Amino acid sequence: MVHALRARRVITPAGSLDAAVVIEGERIATIKPAHELSADIPVRDLGELALLPGLIDVHTHINEPGRTEWEGFATATRAAAAGGFTTVVDMPLNNLPETTTVTALEAKRAATRDEHGRSKCLIDYALWGGCVDGKQEHLEPLAKAGVAGFKSFLIYPGCDGFTEIDRANLERAIPHLLRTGLPLLVHAELAPAIKVATDDLNHLDANWCRYKTYLASRPDEAELDAIAMLLELCRVHRFRLHIVHLSTAKALPMIAAAKREGLPLTVETCPHYLHLSAEQIADGATQFKCAPPIRSAANREQLWQALRDGTIDLIATDHSPCPPAMKKLDRATAGDDAGRFDKAWGGIASLSTALSVVWTECVARGLTLEQLTQWMAARPALLAGIHAQVGAIAPGLHANLIAFDPEASFTLTHEDLHYRHPISPYLGETLRGRVHETWLRGSTVYQFGGSNAIFSDAAQGREYAIS
């Protein structure tokens, strides 16, 4: 079937166009002025809504199989579609078994389908593999089996089933990584600085319900030490290095210098680091806990400048949900641990909110939809190796699209959160920008309906072929 979507603002690599996007089957056939369309092509006029490429999240924790009570493919991909994402790349941890072998990868693939073999995913997806201590021999088989790249932690990841990797094991893994040509994504914090800070706080009998205590326990130095070590290894071995969820702006000078050297380095930050600040987090408000932590407002502004100048490449959600009891939000579920940042799960669920949160900040800074789609679609596609299929509105690419109202303003409520557990640090905030419709390969998968959001009855999401 051939049809067209017309918008006054079609956000393309060439800029914002008043145009019609012609869709043939699952792909974009052409982009042209609406008056040049053949009369026999059905056209839907989106009015003043902007037409954006479907967003791509390269940092999603779906937690299935093994921890479906945390999230799962069905709920995560619904939340993503409502948030304007048409692709997620699932992390290899927080699921059981962890995705560090081909056998575990196949178990995860099986979990994307129901008992009848039908997809549970409303949008498309790719999968990261894990690079952990003692399993270097599995990296090349995982690459051949189709993972998009590998994820490592330099520190305990917060739950059992996935181990951190030390420098010696990382150096053993690098030759395997180089042979695959795939990126290594790294949680860049080292434990020594955190241990010293935490021991000092405990010696002082610090109050762990205070956010400033938690912030002091994850000092900038933990990130700085890790990033310095990673850049040293990258400088020697020239493997593709991607630093996930950068929090500290103090690392920006060394990152910028490494990029000037030509190191194969990319960096992401997250909506919560770009929108929130330590100064606004109330004591006991564990819904704000993540690792690395949310830092100062001044730090946040430096992250924005780094996005503008290219030191930071892209924005990823780090969608990391958990059951409510694990967030230690209240005495009813947490008892004496209520409000303790040292006991609460460190993660923020963001798939439904990321676009509006980021766009709110873009509007405040005079930034454009063209810039936003680079950070949340084009560059994530490049990192995941799917840029020949998605990441922009261009002929030949999948017709993954979103109708977005950049002028809309709304107060975030629980009804806007479509993931399994509606916990969010943004509840009650006034945000800018609303997704009205999401198309996956030319077919509508989500329509905004207020409290009655409309999702496609038939999930058609599939895994990307990574070559």
Could you tell me what each predicted segment is?
Residues 58-71, 99, 124-135, 159-162, ...:
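Active-site mouth loops of central-metabolism enzymes
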Residues 8, 329-340, 395-463:
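C-terminal cap of metal-dependent C-N hydrolases
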Residues 1-3, 9-53:
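Histidine-rich, glycine-flanked metal-binding segment
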Residues 211-229, 233-238, 287, 314-315, ...:
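His/Asp/Glu-enriched, well-ordered alpha-helical/loop segment
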Residues 8, 21, 26, 48, ...:
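Divalent metal-coordination and catalytic microenvironments
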Residues 49-112, 120:
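Metal-associated gating/positioning segment near the N- to mid-region
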Residues 110-130:
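A glycine-rich helix N-cap at a beta->alpha junction
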Residues 137-315:
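Histidine/acidic residue-rich metal-binding segments in metalloenzymes
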